[in-house]
From Swiss-Prot:
Residues 427-429 are annotated as: G5. Residues 53-65 have a biased composition (Basic and acidic residues). One of the essential components for the initiation of protein synthesis. Protects formylmethionyl-tRNA from spontaneous hydrolysis and promotes its binding to the 30S ribosomal subunits. Also involved in the hydrolysis of GTP during the formation of the 70S ribosomal complex. GTP binds at residues 291-298, 337-341, 391-394. Residues 337-340 are annotated as: G3. Residues 282-451 form the tr-type G domain. The lineage of its organism: Bacteria, Bacillati, Bacillota, Bacilli, Bacillales. Residues 391-394 are annotated as: G4. Its main location: cytoplasm. This is Translation initiation factor IF-2.
Length: 781
């Protein structure tokens, strides 16, 4: 015999290749797969094994078949003999011949219901014929479920026989189902109850059931028995949760969930978080320079940095907060230049909270002033050490001892007099005593043991923020802990974004900054508020969600604050008499000036008149500001910003009053005077025209000539002018020359070109706007 493959053998014997392989393995013959060959010896063994298996499988099958049918050839032979013997007897009912068959049927399924044989119509045939007929009937019915009747039933009995067949099959299945259902399934053993569950705020019945390893229906029943009606998705309060858990004997612990959208709480938790002492490193001290106006704060910082910041300020007064970092003896010190006059009280108080050391600058020739006292109170409230810098000791009328004597009244006693306050006499103008002052700062910082963890996500505060036309929202941040990197997802106050670029105080781009370092960043979606906290999160999605949530909450709070008058309290306002109220909209170039001006206006106390600031923002005055002012009958105050041409036209149409200022004292005095007398000023500024700079020409001994195109109104020779760049006033002065072609001109109307030079100003650039104005005297009403 030739070799046979496994799959061929399986196909020939109508079995699967898998079974053939298993049979060969049982015989100890290893084959790889269905393509393997079987030799003759293995084939004989496999045939014997397969034949034996088939015989064993056929034996019970035949036995079952014989039991079910009851008409197999073996058992029917005696019946055939009996029927042949009994068939010779006359008038014997044919139905009696079925008794043995009926007995056999009872072993299987339910017997078929046989009608009595019709003996009257039965033909009296010979015994041989009956025997032959009986044998024929048995042979025909041996394989039928309803067989066994020697008298073949007629056509009327066939449906009945079919019914018996179907009933037999169904009854067998039902019996099998009953046998299976009689064995009840073993219920799963419930899990043990936990010792304690932890929840925050509330839980639904389904959530509580999951924590207790119980079915919700069981909890609903228990709650109902305890007097609480609840559904599976209903939230349970703390009392209901404690009630059901007490019934089960389970302890309950409520987890206090920290609202990450509350940056102040989140900031304090992160700042006070316990860290490994080995990760802490020494950080530079953050120093705030405070004092009375014109006592030399900016000059002191200017001397330290060898810069000329003071020259760029209007009237010699610092209008913006700046942050700078110096390096002395291989150690860094971060300075915050906090403006000193009373208008910046809020900014100074906020600055005191983010700094470590306060330098109180007091002029030796002026002594203690109101802002000096205010700065002392802020520093003491923040619990910061104070170093007194007695400035202007180079002046002949300087009297440092008088300053020291006056400060003792405020618990600032010099070390020379037995106190613990460091006094450092300096001359910021000539640089005298500065090195000693810096040494004192480093000494105090060593005593304070200022440390931070740079190996964490950065947190800190906003020093300043503004809207830049080219870069968008720009914020100056002070990193208080951690390290800030480019690309970090950040939430700053009610704004969010990703840090796109960072510039340090020297104007250089950096990729990361550590603790106590000021840095200017871009990439926020809006301008934050000065003094806002900032936190770096792990992903941008979280930062976006928190920022949007905070912005929406702030908007809702702002709307609710501006709509405090309702039907409930309207009558009370009416009984109080006619309420005089001045609505004010403040627009400034930077956020710090906005807050300072707003804080100053709120302090104005005029009997019968209240100040209500309905809107503050950074940037030029636009049409939306005019629309808001017209709807709320408000006055617009612009600080270092100008209205756009469209906004000015809208203001004239809506009769909206716009007051523009560059020095904050003048704005405060004007508003206070208007509130006291409710009178218009004696002089009113009138804008007569605007011109756009198209080209600039530098001429020696003349300066910069601006080639302009008059876009609105007219430019006159005797008018005052302002140079506006990106909506911000960069210079204010007078026209030196106004020419049309090469001839001098008294005025140039709209639509014409002209050449303009401005007195004492040559930094004119293309796309600047030259605004011409005159002061008109008007009558008091």
């Amino acid at each position: 015999m030739s070799k046979v493959r496994v799959y061929e053998y399986a196909k020939e014997h109508q079995v699967s290749s898998k079974k053939v392989i298993e049979a060969l393995k049982d015989l100890g013959i290893e084959v790889a797969n269905h393509m393997s060959t079987i030799n003759e010896n293995a084939l004989r063994q496999l045939d014997n094994a397969v034949d034996g298996t088939n015989k064993k499988a056929e034996a019970p099958k035949k036995e079952t078949t014989s039991n079910e049918n009851g008409n197999s050839k073996g058992p029917n032979k005696p019946n055939m003999t009996n029927s042949n013997e009994k068939s010779n007897k006359p008038n014997k009912p044919a139905g009696q011949a079925n008794k043995p068959a009926t007995a056999n049927k009872s072993q299987g399924a339910k017997p078929a219901t046989n009608k009595p044989a019709n003996t009257g119509n039965q033909t009296q045939a010979s015994g041989n014929q009956q025997a032959g007929g009986q044998k024929r009937n048995n042979n025909n019915n041996s394989n039928r479920p309803g067989g066994g009747n020697p008298n073949r039933p007629g056509g009327n009995n066939r449906p009945n026989r079919g019914g018996n067949f179907n009933n037999k099959g169904r009854n067998t299945k039902k019996k099998g189902k009953l046998n299976h259902s009689t064995v009840p399934p073993t219920p799963p053993k419930p899990k043990e109850l936990p010792e304690k569950i932890v929840f925050s705020e509330s839980l639904t019945v389904a959530e509580l059931a999951k924590k207790l390893y119980r079915e919700p229906s069981e909890l609903i029943k228990k709650l109902f028995m305890l007097g609480v009606v609840a559904t599976i998705n209903q939230s349970l309060d703390k009392d209901a949760i404690e009630l059901i858990c007490d019934d089960y004997g389970v302890q309950v612990e409520e987890e206090i969930k920290v609202d990450v959208t509350d940056l102040d709480v989140y900031f304090e938790n992160e700042l006070n978080e316990a860290v490994d002492e080995s990760k802490l490193v020494e950080r530079p001290p953050v120093v705030t320079i405070m004092g009375h106006v014109d006592h030399g704060k900016t000059t002191l910082l200017d001397s330290l940095r060898n810069t000329k910041v003071t020259l760029g300020e209007a009237g010699g007064i610092t209008q913006h907060i700046g942050a700078y970092q110096l390096e002395i003896h291989n150690k860094k010190i971060t300075f915050l230049d906090t403006p000193g006059h009373a208008a910046f009280t809020a900014m100074r108080a906020r600055g005191a909270q983010i700094t470590d050391i306060t330098i109180l600058v007091v002029a030796a020739d002026d002594g203690v002033m109101p802002q000096t006292i205010e700065a002392i109170n802020h520093a003491k409230a923040a619990g910061m050490p104070i170093i007194v810098a007695v400035n202007k000791i180079d002046k002949p009328q300087a009297n440092p001892d008088r300053v020291m004597q006056e400060l003792t009244e405020y618990e600032l006693v010099p070390e020379a007099w037995g106190g613990d306050t460091i006094f450092a006499p300096i001359s910021a103008k000539f640089g005298e005593g500065l090195e000693n002052l810096l040494d004192m700062i480093l000494l105090v910082s060593e005593v304070e043991e200022l440390k931070a963890n740079p190996d964490r996500r950065a947190i800190g505060s906003v020093i300043e923020a503004e809207l830049d036309k080219g870069r968008g929202p720009v914020a100056t941040l002070l990193v208080q802990d951690g390290t800030l990197n480019i690309g970090d997802p950040i939430v700053v106050g009610n704004t969010f974004g990703r840090v796109r670029a960072m510039v340090n105080d020297l104007g250089r781009r950096v990729k990361k900054v550590g603790p106590s370092t000021p840095v200017e960043i871009t990439g926020l979606n809006d301008v934050p508020q000065a003094g806002d906290r900032f936190v770096v999160f792990e992903d941008e999605k979280t930062a976006r969600n928190i920022g949007e949530t905070r912005a929406s909450r702030a908007l809702v709070a702002q709307r609710s604050a501006t709509n405090r008058v309702s039907l409930d309290n309207l009558f009370e306002h009416m009984k109080a008499g006619e309420m005089k109220e001045v609505n004010v909209i403040i627009k400034a170039d930077v956020q710090g000036s906005v807050e300072a001006l707003a804080a100053s206006l709120r302090k104005i106390d005029v009997e019968g008149v209240n100040v209500k600031i309905i809107h503050t923002a950074v940037g030029a005055i636009n049409e939306s500001d005019i629309t808001l002012a017209a709807a709320s009958n408000a006055i617009i105050i612009g600080f270092n910003v100008r209205p756009t041409t469209q906004a000015r036209e809208a203001a004239e149409n809506e009769s909206v009053d716009i007051r523009l200022h560059r020095v904050i004292y003048k704005a405060i005095d004007e508003i206070e005077a208007a509130m006291k007398g409710m009178l218009d000023p004696e002089f009113q500024e009138k804008i007569i025209g605007q011109a756009q700079v198209r080209q600039t020409i530098n001429v020696s001994k003349v300066g910069t000539i601006a080639g302009c195109y008059v876009t609105d109104g007219k430019i006159t020779r005797d008018s005052g002018v302002r140079i506006i760049r990106d909506g911000i006033v960069v210079f204010e002065g007078e026209i030196a020359t106004l020419k049309r072609f090469k001839d001098d001109a008294k005025e140039v109307a709209k639509g014409y070109e002209c050449g303009i030079t401005v007195q004492n100003f040559n930094d004119i650039k293309e796309d600047d706007v030259i605004e011409a104005y005159v002061m008109e005297e008007i009558e008091r009403k």
